[in-house]
C-alpha cells in the first residue's frame, strides 16, 4: 500500500573478513605436534622402557607447544571474552595435544563468540542470515577501449556504470565522488560529467540534434591526443636525422670510391656549384694576433677631437699694462651714509612716533584673588572695572577728529 512504512530493518554486523586474520599460531609447530602424536601412537604398541621414555619426551614437547599456543593469544581474544559454555569446551581441548588443521570443517575454537561446538570438531554458526546484495540498476560491464584510447560516445547516460564509492565509473582516480549514488550527482548536488576528447557538440549530438563528428583517434585540433603520440613522435625525428647523416656519408663514399680512370661528364651547373662549395670549405676561420685585432679596431673606431685652447694662444698685447683698482675707505663710508639716509627718510605728517602701542595690555585678563567662591577656587572672575579703565585710556576715540590730525 502506498504510504505504508516498512516495519523492520536488518543490518549485518559480523565481520566477514575475520577468518583472514586467523594466523596467530605457527603452522610449523602444529605440524610438529601432529608428527609427535603419530610417533607416540606408533611407539605405544611396542613394549619396553625405550618406548616409555619416547612417549614421555613426546608428551613434554606437546605440552610445550600447547603452552606456546596459549601465549600467542591475540588482543582480539582478550578484548572479547568467550561465554562460559565455550570456555569449558576450550579448556577440555587445551589438555589434548593440538591436531593439524588440514581436515575440512575443523577450525580453532574460541575465535568468535557466535560459534559453538557440536559433536566432534563441528562448529555451529548461529549468526543471522546475510541479506543478498542489492541489484544495481542499469549496470553493464565496462566497454573495452579501442587502441586510440577513444571513449564510447553513443552510449546514453542511463546505461553508464554506477559512479559510487569504489564503483566502475570513470571518476577521479578510478573512484567516483558520489556517495553510493549512481546518477552522476554527488552529495552537494553538483553533477560531474565524464571527460571526453573533442567538443561537447559531438559528444551529445544524438540528444541536441547537431551533426555528429567522428573521432580522429585523439589527433587534430581541440583534442588531447593519445598516449602513443609521445612514443611515435620522437623516433620520427631521430630517423630523419639519421637518414640525413647517412645520405651525406653515402655521397662522400661514392665520390671517394670512384676510380680515377673513369671519365665524368657532369653538367656545367653542377660544376659551378661544386666549385663554390669547395671555395667555401677552403675558407676556414681567420686567425690573427692580438695586435692585429687591436689595429683593426682602432681603424674602425671614430676619433674624438676637442677644440682646446692652448696657454697664451690668441693673447692681445693691449691688456698687458692693466692693473687692479681698489676702492678707498672714505668712498665706502659715504656710500653707506647715503644708503641709511635714504632708507629712514620719513614724511612730515607721520604720526607713528606719537602713538604708543603696548601689546601687554591686550593679553589675558588677570586672575581673581585666592579664596573666591568659598575659599577653594584659584581662578575667580576678573575685575571688569579695571579692565575697562585701561582699555579706555589706551584706545583712541574714533569720533574725536583731534585724535587723528593727519586726516584733518
UniProtKB/Swiss-Prot annotation:
Region (Disordered): 33-292, 328-408
GO molecular function, one term: SUMO binding
Residues recorded with modification Omega-N-methylarginine: 165, 188, 216, 364, 367, 370
Post-translational modifications reported in the UniProt record: Phosphorylation by MTOR inhibits SERBP1 and relieves ribosome hibernation.
Positions of post-translational N6-acetyllysine modification: 52, 68, 122, 140, 211, 329
Modification Phosphoserine, positions: 25, 197, 199, 203, 205, 208, 221, 234, 330, 392, 394
Annotated protein name in UniProt: SERPINE1 mRNA-binding protein 1
